[in-house]
């Protein structure tokens, strides 16, 4: 084992005052030569995603001690996307990714920790932790709090998206308030992150593929005992990684990020994975750009039938073999690199050796590579005169991913949702929500409320929605987000007007408005940059330093 970083605070007579502080929190003479390991605990009762984390943190803390390390637990924040969705509070969601990253980096570096075990649940916990882990490059492991089990109503599996869609169903007269109330009361049965292949489960899968969490751990249910066992094992592995000096940047390679992109295509993962992978790769110094997603999409099919557009939830994926089973299928097809390593020091080929070549026959969640749900990945990167830097279209569950129609312009999510619920949006419309980007929002809110209302009204196949904001992992339909440049910095989305004809063509990776370059420039002369919405506080600070979404909406971009 190399010299411990923590020796800066534990060794030598000049560090006697430092040691005195450590003695007060439980250190004894023999402990000052052990690795000090941070336990970044995202426990919170704000959200069901994080309310089960403390038992995992305590088990990991105990396991670190038994394995020869000294744990130091500290808290980090979470917000609940599901609770803040559709409100002003959602502007803080993506901001929380940066706060989580900054807080973990700050605590670990201030205290000269030798490693970190991060525990999280809700969407931004995972990329926030990974950004910090990449910045610090000290031995690290991530423990996912686990997925929620599906809610049940009359034999039907429910998720939180069921409740959002029920709102649209109510306003269009498809259900009554009694049914809405039943869905509300039954869709979230306990602890865990939202149960479909939404953002949290997508990002936990990304971390597993990158090798910074244990195989199978990303799809475990929060309330199952195997999750506690996995937390204990993760702590043991981390202590061993410190001894072997296995560091995150040894694992975060271009090939491992490409593997992660391949897997999110195969499982039908969230659009937010594009934003977060770009951000993590940027921090790690790996050259991954938005075009890599389109390149990989062209060759990797969707082989998992998972919600929001499919039939099954993440616990079903786990029971069918989880991410290792998906990876084995992709490995055999030559679609991922088997030489990438994980935190245990094993290559993908090594740790998948005993995984069956084919998925179990008694399930329909994972398909063979020659019988995919979709022949190409579901996250298409579109470009055109509305998005010169690119944007992300999610086309799973859409029979015809091409629509040309008149623009319906909204300057905020609230205005758009109001119009949808008033039944003002008609088949063939292209709904435009702008000034919701990283700078303009600020914070790049997720548009789950309007997209779910559109689906709930039966317009999911008949209306396109485009935005410089984001979408929830629970969104499906013909939706296009992350349009860059965004409206607030003068992107062309700021120049379109009500009724302009817009083409969204995910087949040919095109998004454009039928206006000449001359007309766009004429309109630009009259465009006025929006006045910042916030003068003080975290949103004001964020809007001044955040990058474009095509670079991951990061706040520490090298100048």
Swiss-Prot record:
The residues annotated as the active site are 472
The coenzyme or cofactor needed here is:
[2Fe-2S] cluster; Mg(2+)
Modification N6-carboxylysine, positions:
124
Q: Where is the signal peptide?
A: none
User: Cofactor note, please?
Assistant: Binds 1 [2Fe-2S] cluster per subunit. This cluster acts as a Lewis acid cofactor.
Q: Which domain of life is it from?
A: Bacteria
Q: Which NCBIfam families match?
A: ilvD, PRK00911.1
**Residues reported to bind Mg(2+):** 81, 123-124, 446
Q: Which residues bind [2Fe-2S] cluster?
A: 49, 122, 194
Q: What is its EC number?
A: 4.2.1.9
Can you name this protein?
Answer: Dihydroxy-acid dehydratase
């Amino acid at each position: 084992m190399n010299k411990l970083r923590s020796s800066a605070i534990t060794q030598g007579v000049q560090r006697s005052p430092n040691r005195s502080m450590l003695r007060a929190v439980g250190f004894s003479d023999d402990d000052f030569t052990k690795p000090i390991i941070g336990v970044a605990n995202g426990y919170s009762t704000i959200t069901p995603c994080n309310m089960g984390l403390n038992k995992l943190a305590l088990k990991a803390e105990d396991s670190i001690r038994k394995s020869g390390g000294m744990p130091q637990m500290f808290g980090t924040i979470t917000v609940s996307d599901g609770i803040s969705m559709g409100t002003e509070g959602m502007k803080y969601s993506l901001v929380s990714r940066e706060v989580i990253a900054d807080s973990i980096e700050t605590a670990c570096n201030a205290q000269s920790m030798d490693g970190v075990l991060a525990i999280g649940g809700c969407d931004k916990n995972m990329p926030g932790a990974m950004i910090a882990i990449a910045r610090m490059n000290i031995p690290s492991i991530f423990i996912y709090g686990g997925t929620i089990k599906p809610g049940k109503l009359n034999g039907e599996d429910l998720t939180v998206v069921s409740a959002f869609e029920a709102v649209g169903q109510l306003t269009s007269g498809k259900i009554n308030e009694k049914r809405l109330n039943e869905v509300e009361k039954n869709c979230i049965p306990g602890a865990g992150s939202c149960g479909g292949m939404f953002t949290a489960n997508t990002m936990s899968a990304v971390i597993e593929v990158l090798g910074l969490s244990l195989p199978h751990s990303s799809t475990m249910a929060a309330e199952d005992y195997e999750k506690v066992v996995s937390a204990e094992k993760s702590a043991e592995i981390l202590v061993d990684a410190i001894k072997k000096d296995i560091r995150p940047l040894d694992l975060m390679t271009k090939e491992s990020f490409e593997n992660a992109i391949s897997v999110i295509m195969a499982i039908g993962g969230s659009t937010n994975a594009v934003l977060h992978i770009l951000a993590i790769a940027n921090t790690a110094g790996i050259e991954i750009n938005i075009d890599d997603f389109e390149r990989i999409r062209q060759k990797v099919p969707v082989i998992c039938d998972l919600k929001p557009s499919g039939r099954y939830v993440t616990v079903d994926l786990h029971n069918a073999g989880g991410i290792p089973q998906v990876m084995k299928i992709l490995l055999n097809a030559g679609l991922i690199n088997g030489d990438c390593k994980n935190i245990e020091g094993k290559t993908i080929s090594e740790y998948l050796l005993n995984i069956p070549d084919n998925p179990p026959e008694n399930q329909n969640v994972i398909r063979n590579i020659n019988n995919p749900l979709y022949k190409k990945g579901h996250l298409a990167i579109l470009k055109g005169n509305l998005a010169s830097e690119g944007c992300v279209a999610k086309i799973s569950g859409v029979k015809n991913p091409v629509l040309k129609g008149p623009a319906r312009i909204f300057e905020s999510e609230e205005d758009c949702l109001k119009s949808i619920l008033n039944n003002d949006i008609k088949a063939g419309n292209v709904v435009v929500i702008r000034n919701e980007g990283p700078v303009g929002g600020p914070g790049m809110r997720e548009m789950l409320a309007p997209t779910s209302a559109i689906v709930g009204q039966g317009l999911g196949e008949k209306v396109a929605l485009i935005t410089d904001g984001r979408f929830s992992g629970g969104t499906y339909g013909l939706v296009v987000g992350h349009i860059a440049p965004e409206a607030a910095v003068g992107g062309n989305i700021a120049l379109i007007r009500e009724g302009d004809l817009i083409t969204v063509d995910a087949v040919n990776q095109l998004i454009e408005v039928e206006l000449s370059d001359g007309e766009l420039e004429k309109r630009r002369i009259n465009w006025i940059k929006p006045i910042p919405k916030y003068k003080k506080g975290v949103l004001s600070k964020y809007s001044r330093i955040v990058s474009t979404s095509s670079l991951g909406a990061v706040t520490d971009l090298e100048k």
